[in-house]
Curated annotation (Swiss-Prot):
Listed GO MF terms: ATP binding; proton-transporting ATP synthase activity, rotational mechanism
Family: Belongs to the ATPase epsilon chain family.
Organism field: Burkholderia thailandensis (strain ATCC 700388 / DSM 13276 / CCUG 48851 / CIP 106301 / E264)
Keywords, ordered alphabetically: ATP synthesis, Cell inner membrane, Cell membrane, CF(1), Hydrogen ion transport, Ion transport, Membrane, Transport
Location within or outside the cell: Cell inner membrane
Bilayer disposition of the protein: Peripheral membrane protein
InterPro entries for this protein: ATP_F1_dsu/esu_C_sf, ATP_synth_F1_dsu/esu, ATP_synth_F1_dsu/esu_N, ATP_synth_F1_esu_C, ATPsynth_dsu/esu_N
Record's protein name: ATP synthase epsilon chain
Superkingdom to which the source organism belongs: Bacteria
Record bears the keyword Manganese: no
PANTHER family: ATP SYNTHASE DELTA/EPSILON CHAIN, ATP SYNTHASE EPSILON CHAIN, CHLOROPLASTIC
Length: 141
């Protein structure tokens, strides 16, 4: 089966690098599915789960807090603002971040504070959703 080179990187580290049969991630306009031979594309990505079906058939999951996706004929590159391997996601930390963001939202004094709190809340909610999706998938295996 055809494969495509996939790299997921954040400012801190390279999270994934390898060959994949399929990549799914939250694009700006909705969920994107990328197969080998996909049309070249550059777009922003929303906070959420990146699912990579590796060449071996194993699935890798990475949570990204937004970023940029570049698709070229033989490569997919995800440049993430922040990226966390699926196995490293922590529901308690994500829930605490959600609560802090909601509290900050309630106490926002300026438009900048409000926008920052909304962004933090969206990221925390996306992380919790990614954790739930990953738990469901793991439950099927």
């Amino acid at each position: 089966m055809a494969t495509i080179k996939v790299d997921v990187v954040s400012a801190e580290e390279q999270i994934f690098s390898g060959l994949a049969k399929f990549v799914a991630l939250p694009g700006e306009a909705g969920e994107l599915g990328i197969l080998p031979g996909h049309t070249p594309l550059i777009t922003r990505i929303r906070p959420g789960a990146v699912r990579i079906e590796a060449e071996s058939g194993d699935e890798e999951f990475v949570f990204v807090a937004g970023g940029i996706l570049e698709v070229q004929p033989g490569a997919v590159t995800v440049l993430a603002d922040t990226a966390i391997r699926g196995k490293d996601l922590d529901a308690a930390k994500a829930e605490e971040a959600r609560k802090r963001a909601e509290e900050t939202l309630q106490n926002a004094k300026s438009d900048i504070d409000l926008a920052k709190a909304q962004s933090e809340l969206a990221t925390a909610m996306a992380q919790l959703e990614a954790i739930q999706r990953l738990a469901k998938i793991r439950g099927r295996h």
